Amino acid sequence: MDTRGCAWLLLLLSLPQGQSHQPLHRSKRRWVLTTLELQEEDPGPFPKLVGELFNNMSNNVSLIYLIRGPGVDEFPEIGLFSIEDHQSGKIYVHRPVDREVTPSFMVHFDAVDRSTGKVVDESLIFNIRIRDVNDHAPQFPEKEFNISVKESQAAGQPIFQLLTVDLDQENTPNSQVLYFLVSQTPLLRESGFRIDLISGEVRLSGCLHYETAPLFTLIVRASDCGEPSLTSTATIHVSVEDSNNHMPTFMEDRYEIRISEGQVEQGVLYLPVQDGDSPFTPAWRTQFNIWDGNEEGHFDIVTDPETNQGLLSIIKPLDYESQVAHSLVVVVENQEQLFVCTEGQLQPLRKAMASTMVSVQVLDTNDPPAFHPQSFIVSEEDGAWPAIQLGYFNATDPDRADSQIRYKLVHDPENWVTVDEKSGVVTTKKQIDRESPHVNDSFYTIIVHAVDNGLPPLTGTGTLMLFLSDVNDNAPTLRPHSRHLEVCESAGSQPLLIEAEDADLDPYADPFTFDLDNAQGDVEETWMLRTKQGEGHSAELTMLRSVPPGDYLVPLFIADRQGLAQKQTVHVRICSCRSGSECEEPSDTWLLWWALSPVGAALMVLSAALLCLLRCSCTFGPKRLRGFIPSDSGHQTLIVYNEESKVPSAQGCDTFFEPRGVKTLLSSTPVYLDRMVPRQQPLQLLEGRVVEAWSQKLQSIDVLEGDTGYLPHVYREEGECEGAETLSSLTFLEQDLSPKLLGCSGSKSTPSEAMCFTSRVPS
C-alpha cells in the first residue's frame, strides 16, 4: 500500500512588517507537507520514502530542513526516520514499525538559513501515524477452564463468560471478536450448551442429569473481523454438582416397638431410608420429623450422620396408666429442596416428604408414688413452738388405688419436725429459729420420701419449703472487733468506732440506738457515746477526761428499731505508745485468748499430764516421812563430807523443786520423800523443769494477788521474842519421838541413830 497520504496540510504563518506610512501588510509563510502515514509491519524495501516537506521561504533564502524528536533522535525507535536531501526535504523510514508498540510519532520539522544557520521559521510538529494491520489473533487468558454447575441449574441462565484480548487497534474490525461453540462432549439431546456470539456467555439449554453425564467438555473459538480473520480456541470442562432430584423413601411402611413405662432411652428404633443422590451431600442427607402423635413431647428423632437413618428416642417417660399405646407419623425429607425437570424445563423447587407409621406399645411397670403437689410452701413465724402442725404430704400410687404408702423424713438438718408415717402430717418437735445456718433467704427445706409396697418398692420425693417470717427475737450485739478496743494515751480524745449487728431482718434491725449504762454513776463523766451520722449500725465512743493507762469496761445498751435492747460491754485499753500509734505491751486479753486457744489448751493439758507423772513418782516406793525439807539440801545432789564413821545404809529422799514463793515457804503442805535416789533420764529432767517453771509461775501469781505497790504488812503478832533455853531444859520423853524422825536427816545422823537405839536390839 502506498504510504503517501492524499491530503495536504497547509500551515500559514505571518510576520510583522516594519513601520511606514503605507498601510501595514502581513507577509505569509507556509509549510507545505504531504501527509505522513506508515503501514504497520511494512515489508520494505528500506529506506523507503515517507513524504516531502517544503517551506516557501526557500524562494528567497537557501534553506536546510531538519527533523528531530521520537523516531529520529529520541526513544523509542531512534534512527527510524531521516531526511536524505536537506534541500529537497524528502523523509525516509528505515525499518518496519509495530503499531502495538508505538502507534504514532510526534516529529518536529525546522527550516534553517544555510548561510547563517539560524532558524527562519517556527517549528512544525507533525504526527506520523502507523496504520494498523490485523496481525494479532484474539487471546484467551487460559487454554483450559474448569467450572462447576449445579444439576438444578435453570436453562437460559449464564453459567460462564469467556473474555479475550486482541492487541490490534481498538474499535476496528481487527479487534472485534466473535465466539463460537465448536463441540460438546458428550452430546445429549436433553442436555446442551450454547454460547453468545458477542458477549461470550455460556448458557445451558435443557436440563442436566448428574447420573447420566456428570462431566461435559466444550471447545470454543474466538475469531476477529480483520482481513484475514485470525482465531484461537479454548477448552471448558463443566462438572455437574449433584442436586436433589431423588426423594428419600422409607424401607417399611409401618414399624412396631414395645417400651416399658417410666424409661428414658436413646435409639429405641432405627428408621433406614433410600436416596438415589450422591452420598454425604445436602441432596442426600435427610431430616426426620414426627408429624403426628407426639403432642406430649415423649419422643424425639434425629438423623445419624453416618448412615443417614432416623434414630427414635424416648426423652420423656411414658405412663401406662395414662396411655397404653402411641401412633406416630414420621416424615423424612432432604436438606436440599427437590427439583424436577420436565421436557427440558426445570420446574419450581418444592419440598417433598415421605412418611411411615410407628406403633409404640407401652408395657406396665411399678410406678413410684406421686406427690400432689410435688413441692409446696408453708409459712410460719420464727420461734414457733413444738407440736404445731405445718401441713401434710399427699402421695398416691399411679398403679393401684389400694397401695399402702409410707412417708419417711429424709432431709431435716435441724431436726425440727416429724412426719407421720401413714398420714404424712408434718409437725414441729422443737422450737424453730430463723437464724439457723440451714435457713436460706428465710426458707427451710424439708424433704420427704413416699415408699409404696410394690415389688420392688419404689420411692417418690416431695418437698416442703418452710417460709419463716421474722420476729424480733434478737437484740443487737457488738461486732467481735468492737468488743476489745485499744487507744494510745496520747490520743485519748480520738473517737473509737463501735459497730453492732442484729440477726433479725427489717424492721427489727437497724438503725440502732446506743446509750451508756450509767448505773455506777461515773461512766458518763468519763465517756461520751454518740451515734454516727448517716449510719444506723455504728456509734463513736469518746473519752471526756484523761485517765491513767489500764483496762476499762464501758457498759452500754444497744436497742433496735423496735426498742429491743441488750446490755453490752466494751473493753477499752489505754496504753503507752512508743511510735504514737501502737501499744508497747500486748493486752492481757490476748493472754486469755491464748490460754483459751487450741494451742494453749494443748500445752496446759501436757503440763497437767507431766505433773501427774511426777505425783505418781513421788508416791511410789517404801514408807515415806512427812517433814519440812530445808532449801539448802540441794537439788538432786548427794552430799558427801568424807566421813570416817560407820558407813551409812543406802537411803535418800525424793528430788523435788523448791517453789520460790512466799506462800510456799509459809505453808505446811507435806512433802513425800523416797528412800531411793533414782537415776534421772532426759524425759524426767524435762518433766522436772516444766513442773518447776509452772510452779514458780503459779506461786508468783498467788503472791501478786495484792497490790505490789504497798509495803510489807504484819499479818500475825505472836508477842515479844524470849531468850533461848538450854537443851537440858527441854523435857520430852523418848517415847514421844517418832522412829521416823531421822529417816531423811542425811548421812550425818545415821551413826548416831545406830548408837542411840543399840540397847533396844535383843542380844
From Swiss-Prot:
Recorded topology in the membrane: Single-pass type I membrane protein
Keyword 4Fe-4S: no
One GO cellular component, as annotated: plasma membrane
SUPFAM superfamilies in alphabetical order: Cadherin-like
UniProt GO molecular function: alpha-catenin binding; beta-catenin binding; calcium ion binding; delta-catenin binding; integrin binding
Domain of life: Eukaryota
Residues bearing glycans: 56, 60, 146, 394, 440
Biological-process GO terms, alphabetical: CD4-positive, alpha-beta T cell activation; homophilic cell adhesion via plasma membrane adhesion molecules
TM helices/strands, residue ranges: 591-611
Gene3D superfamilies assigned: Cadherins
Ranges in a coiled coil: none
Signal peptide location: 1-20
Keywords, alphabetical: Calcium, Cell adhesion, Cell membrane, Glycoprotein, Membrane, Metal-binding, Repeat, Signal, Transmembrane, Transmembrane helix
Note on domains (UniProt): Three calcium ions are usually bound at the interface of each cadherin domain and rigidify the connections, imparting a strong curvature to the full-length ectodomain.
Name this protein carries in UniProt: Cadherin-like protein 26
Organism whose genome encodes this protein: Mus musculus (Mouse)
Gene: Cdh26
